[in-house]
């Protein structure tokens, strides 16, 4: 089975951290880096984050490229948003859930998360697709998830995870 190619994106402070001492990670980089990341988002079919990032930052995970006359911006599109959330803790009022009807959104969870069938139904009603994977030490089975995503035609993923998801993906060789 074909699995997506994964590009891991992260910013790091001079002392090797991916967030400031307050936990803020949004403004470690500058304007040029953020513009580059928007281009990466536009080129990848999917974008993946963990529930920790969603809870900490309430991100949109969209492609925000300004219309421009000096470059090709006619084909700007949003990647499919993929959130790894083993216990289905994603807030129903998060920006990702609130915009799931407009931007394709997948939440990958385990049996523990999927056991909240009422929340699953509410998320589905808002446009979220739920993928249930096997449980690996209390976490989403990332290898199984990649196979499922590849089967859905997602050939490239921009990984914008925090330390935990990034470590897990690298450890699994994904």
Describe every region a protein language model picked out:
Residues 3, 7-14, 18-155, 164-167:
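Active-site ligand-binding patch in enzyme domains
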Residues 159:
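Gly/Thr-rich phosphate-binding loop signature of adenosyl cofactor/nucleotide-binding cores
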Residues 173-174:
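C-terminal structured "cap/appendage" subdomains that terminate the fold
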């Amino acid at each position: 089975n074909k699995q997506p190619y994964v590009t891991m994106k992260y910013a790091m402070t001079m002392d090797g951290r991916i967030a400031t001492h307050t936990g803020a990670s949004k403004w470690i980089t500058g304007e040029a880096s953020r513009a580059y990341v928007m281009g990466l988002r536009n080129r990848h079919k999917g974008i993946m984050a963990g529930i920790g990032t969603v809870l900490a930052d309430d991100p949109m995970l969209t492609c925000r490229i300004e219309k421009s006359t000096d470059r090709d911006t006619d084909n700007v599109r949003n990647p499919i948003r993929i959130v790894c959330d083993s216990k289905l803790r994603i807030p129903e009022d998060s920006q990702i859930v609130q915009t799931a009807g407009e931007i394709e959104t997948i939440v990958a969870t385990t049996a523990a998360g999927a056991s909240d069938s009422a929340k699953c139904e509410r998320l589905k009603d808002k446009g979220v697709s739920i993928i249930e994977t096997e449980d690996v030490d209390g976490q989403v089975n990332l290898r199984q998830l990649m196979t499922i995503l590849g089967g859905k035609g997602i050939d490239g993923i921009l990984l914008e995870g925090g330390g935990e998801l990034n470590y897990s993906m690298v450890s699994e060789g994904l």
